[in-house]
C-alpha cells in the first residue's frame, strides 16, 4: 500500500487514488458501477453531452446510483470541436456537479477535438478555452498531445494538471509517446495524468514508474471481457507503478553483479 501522505493533489483537492475512471462504452450500467467500485478510484469522469439536463428527472441514469459523498465528479467536454463549445460544456458540467451535491466542484477535463478521424486534441482551441475557463474560476485539466511546450504553456496559464495522451484515444496502443511524456513529467510543476491509449495494467504501471502522477482509463476497462476484474487489475497496476517510482529503480549496469558476493561468504567462514 502507498503511504497515506502520498496523495494526489489537484487544485485545492486531495485524492487517495491515482487512478481515474471514465464512464463510457460499458455494456451495461451494472458493469460500469461495479468497475468504478472495484477500481477504488476517487475521480470519475463523465461526458456532459451524453447526459440529460436534469438528473433529478432521470431515474434511469446510472449517475444517480453512485455515492457522490465518496466520489469526485470530473465533467469532460468530449465532443467539443471548438473552444466555444468546450466552454459551454464546462459550465453545464458545473451545473451537473451541483446536481450531485458538489456545489464547490469547478473541475473540468478540457477536451477540444476538431479532428473527427484521429481524435487528436486541438492545441490552439485547448489553449483558448483553458485561458477563459481559468479566468472564470474553473480547475482545468486539459487533454493534450504529448507536446512538452504545449504542456508548459498550459501550466503557465494556470491549469491544475496536464493530461498528455499515451497514444490515440481508444486505441489501446500503450505508451507510444514515451520520450515526450518523459520530458513533460520532468518539466512539469503540476500533476501529469496519462490519458488515452493505455490498454493493459502493465502499461499503467509503466506510466507510473516514469513518474506520472496518475492515469485516466476508460476503454481498457469498459471493453475488456470482464470490466470489473480489469478495473481491479488497473488499480493494482497503478499502485505498483507508484510504489516502484517512490522506491527508486536500481542502477543499470553493463556487467553482471552477483547477488551473493564471495567476499561476503568468506566473512562468515
Curated annotation (Swiss-Prot):
Compartments (UniProt record): Plastid, Chloroplast
Enzyme class: transferase
Plastid keyword on record: yes
EC number: 2.8.1.10
Any Gene Ontology CC annotation: chloroplast
Classification via Pfam families: ThiG
Reactions catalysed: [ThiS sulfur-carrier protein]-C-terminal-Gly-aminoethanethioate + 2-iminoacetate + 1-deoxy-D-xylulose 5-phosphate = [ThiS sulfur-carrier protein]-C-terminal Gly-Gly + 2-[(2R,5Z)-2-carboxy-4-methylthiazol-5(2H)-ylidene]ethyl phosphate + 2 H2O + H(+)
Keywords: Chloroplast, Plastid, Schiff base, Thiamine biosynthesis, Transferase
GO molecular function: thiazole synthase activity
InterPro entries: Aldolase_TIM, Thiazole_synthase_ThiG, ThiG
Function comment: Catalyzes the rearrangement of 1-deoxy-D-xylulose 5-phosphate (DXP) to produce the thiazole phosphate moiety of thiamine. Sulfur is provided by the thiocarboxylate moiety of the carrier protein ThiS. In vitro, sulfur can be provided by H(2)S.
PANTHER family: THIAZOLE SYNTHASE
UniProt family annotation: Belongs to the ThiG family.
Protein name, UniProt field: Thiazole synthase
Gene that specifies this protein: thiG
Amino acid at each position: 500500500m502507498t503511504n497515506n501522505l502520498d496523495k494526489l493533489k489537484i487544485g485545492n483537492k486531495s485524492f487517495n487514488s491515482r487512478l481515474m475512471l471514465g464512464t463510457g462504452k460499458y455494456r451495461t450500467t451494472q458493469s460500469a458501477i461495479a468497475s468504478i467500485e472495484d477500481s477504488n478510484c476517487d475521480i470519475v469522469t463523465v461526458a456532459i453531452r451524453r447526459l440529460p439536463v436534469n438528473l433529478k428527472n432521470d431515474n434511469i441514469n446510472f449517475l444517480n446510483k453512485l455515492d457522490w459523498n465518496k466520489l469526485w465528479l470530473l465533467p469532460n467536454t468530449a465532443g467539443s470541436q471548438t473552444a466555444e463549445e468546450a466552454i459551454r460544456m464546462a459550465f453545464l458540467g458545473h451545473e451537473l456537479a451541483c446536481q450531485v451535491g458538489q456545489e464547490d466542484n469547478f473541475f473540468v477535463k478540457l477536451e477540444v477535438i476538431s479532428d473527427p478521424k484521429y481524435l487528436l486534441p486541438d492545441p490552439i482551441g485547448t489553449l483558448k478555452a483553458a485561458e477563459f475557463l481559468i479566468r472564470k474560476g474553473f480547475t482545468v485539466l486539459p487533454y493534450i498531445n504529448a507536446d512538452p511546450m504545449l504542456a508548459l504553456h498550459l501550466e503557465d496559464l494556470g491549469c491544475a494538471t496536464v493530461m498528455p495522451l499515451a497514444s490515440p484515444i481508444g486505441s489501446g496502443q500503450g505508451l507510444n509517446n514515451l520520450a515526450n511524456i518523459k520530458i513533460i513529467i520532468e518539466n512539469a510543476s503540476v500533476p501529469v495524468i496519462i490519458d488515452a491509449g493505455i490498454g493493459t495494467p502493465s502499461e499503467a504501471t509503466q506510466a507510473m514508474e516514469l513518474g506520472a502522477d496518475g492515469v485516466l482509463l476508460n476503454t481498457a476497462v469498459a471493453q475488456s471481457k470482464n470490466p470489473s476484474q480489469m478495473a481491479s487489475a488497473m488499480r493494482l497496476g497503478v499502485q505498483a507503478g507508484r510504489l516502484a517510482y517512490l522506491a527508486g529503480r536500481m542502477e543499470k549496469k553493463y556487467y553482471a553483479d552477483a547477488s551473493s558476493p564471495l567476499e561476503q561468504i568468506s566473512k562468515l567462514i
